[in-house]
Design a protein with these regions (language model features):
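Nucleotidyl polymerases of mobile genetic elements and RNA viruses
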Residues: 1-165, 169
């Protein structure tokens, strides 16, 4: 086990260490897959998310899949992988661009590092809902904003929540 004291003196940290028999750690750290930091989350701590998506792609035989099958994998697997992190923290736009480039290359070409000029539809059009002529792929930037706005909505409409007094991102 480990304990991470926040705004505690060294005496309190050593008391925690001796009383709980746990290692005392410090920030930044990873908790439930989320990189936690006292300051803004550095891009380097979000690179494991990009690696996780790349490992997922490596297991699929993309050359054997039709474009429709790749679209289904993009919509239901690849776009869903970063949702847990998007709900809690603001991801650096450079990391989001890397993820969206990986998704785009997989969708259109079935491989990584494809030429962007050979895409059949622009990315903003692709991210539109099906009812509006798009393919229903999530725009990760807008998804992150909407997920974090959900916390603000719950804070405004339900003051009985235990985290109501906390400052939200």
């Amino acid at each position: 086990c480990s304990a991470t004291p926040i705004r505690c003196d060294e005496e309190v940290a050593s008391t925690i260490d001796s009383t709980l028999a746990c290692a005392v750690t410090s920030f930044p750290l990873v908790y439930l897959g989320l990189p936690l930091s006292v300051r803004k989350t550095p891009s380097s701590s979000l690179l494991p998310l990009v690696d996780k998506i790349m490992r997922k792609l490596a297991t699929w035989k993309a050359a054997l899949l039709t474009r429709g099958e790749r679209l289904a994998l993009v919509r239901h697997v690849l776009s869903a992988m970063p949702v847990h992190i998007l709900m809690a923290i603001v991801i650096n736009p450079s990391i989001l661009k890397k993820i969206m480039r990986i998704i785009r290359d997989f969708l259109w070409h079935g491989r990584r590092n494809a030429r962007s000029g050979s895409c059949l539809v622009s990315w903003p059009r692709l991210c539109r809902p099906i009812e509006f002529g798009g393919l229903g792929v999530r725009d990760l930037y807008l998804t992150g904003i909407s997920l974090r706005c959900r916390w603000l909505w719950l804070k405004a409409t339900d003051p009985a929540r235990p985290w109501h007094h906390l400052q939200l991102p």
